[in-house]
Amino acid sequence: MFTVVIVGRPNVGKSTLFNRMIKSDEKIKAITDKFPGVTRDINYGVAKWDDKEFIVVDTGGFFPEEKIEDIIQKQMLEQIEMAISDADLIIHLLDSKEGLLPDDIETARQLRQTGKDILWVVNKIDDPSKLSRIYDFYSIGTEELIPISGITGYGFDELIDKIIEKIPDTQPVNLEQQNLPKIAVVGRPNVGKSTIINALLGKKRMIVSPIPGTTRDTIDAICTYYGKKYLLIDTAGIKRLSYYKKEISQEIYVERLAYFKALRSIERADVAILVIDALEGIVNQDQKIAGIVAEQKKGLIILINKWDLIPANERDKKAKFFTDEIKHKLWFVDYAPYLTVSAIDKTRLTKIFPLIDQILEEYSKRVSTSELNRLFSEKLKDVIMSSHGKELKFYYITQVNVAPPTFVVFVNDQSAVKQHHIKFIEKLLRETFHFKFSPINIKIKQRK
């Protein structure tokens, strides 16, 4: 698909323009704010205008190589260069309020060396009265500048027209229509989520470093396994909610936005992969993240990462420890399979995909009403249970939805149904109809 990459210095408005271009309902698709450098990872989205579709790529702030100060900036620059190499069209976004700076001129020089098609776009021209700001930018070496405002939308239609003119008249591929399985990778900061994604993709799509919290935006990437495509979502590490109640600083503010983006990623997903640190075990925050997945009735795979750091002679004992730990601390997602993996060594990572396929097959499975009531007839119809002095009788059951499989059970007294009754029915459904790894949603209704 035709790919447009937005490049520019930190805080020139790249993410704001990106969000406007993809018209996303997810208003924080890319984290935006007044703080410089809040986009550290690459964001991908699909824009559709005038029956034309194209990929839009929002990059981190571009800066000359000689100004690199740390490992994070070095990795950011590598990501941007990779995105530029995949581009069909580059938007060099400039800031009219700050004016033309030496870094803009150096960036323009480097972009010209790529030989790619470039649009020179001057942002923060909120209305025609600000047009005089653009004249200094002609010295960058172009005959055409496009004045816009990512916030107000001034000049935006003209920019879209310019982009559409450059898209070949070929049938676009709609990523959403491909109906790819959507997989959210979730977990606490620094448990290895991005390393896992990078290993599955075979290239560095995300910043990976020993510094906790280096992924702040959710990132979508397509992974292919034996010809089948999966949409992988790497979320920012989810921290304790109490963490976000502290006094707001720049870092905490951005992390708070990232927290809610992570929740949105779980909402988007079909299956969530919860990454747990093998050295730290299952902690309270892991339980809370699993609880979010369970509440939303998403498929779940638990990955015990950093298995390479467990001494070989202790791994059997450690595996048994995690089996017991999952039963004890994650009892509410007892249907979820788990794997011990090493993102660094790429050990057992490919076992994820058969599990995803099985979960998705079960997740969309439909059981006929006749089969369900045959089960009830055999197991429950004549069974009368007591609950606090009340007689509870099950009449019949029907499946009303898939993704997740949702069943409605009709009883004589809805108030008498307790959680252990629901777990009993769930166990029957799982054993009889082979819902091994998928969540099941059971609703109780009183027969009138």
From Swiss-Prot:
The keyword Acetylation does not apply. Pfam families: KH_dom-like, MMR_HSR1. GO terms for molecular function: GTP binding; ribosome binding. Residues 365-448 form the KH-like domain. GTP 2 binds at residues 187-194, 234-238, 305-308. Gene3D superfamilies: 3.30.300.20, P-loop containing nucleotide triphosphate hydrolases. Signal peptide: none annotated. Keywords: GTP-binding, Nucleotide-binding, Repeat, Ribosome biogenesis. GTP 1 binds at residues 8-15, 58-62, 123-126. One of its GO terms (biological process) is ribosome biogenesis. Residues 2-171, 181-364 form the EngA-type G domain. It comes from the Bacteria. The keyword Repeat applies. GTPase that plays an essential role in the late steps of ribosome biogenesis. Associates with the 50S ribosomal subunit. Belongs to the TRAFAC class TrmE-Era-EngA-EngB-Septin-like GTPase superfamily. EngA (Der) GTPase family. This is GTPase Der.
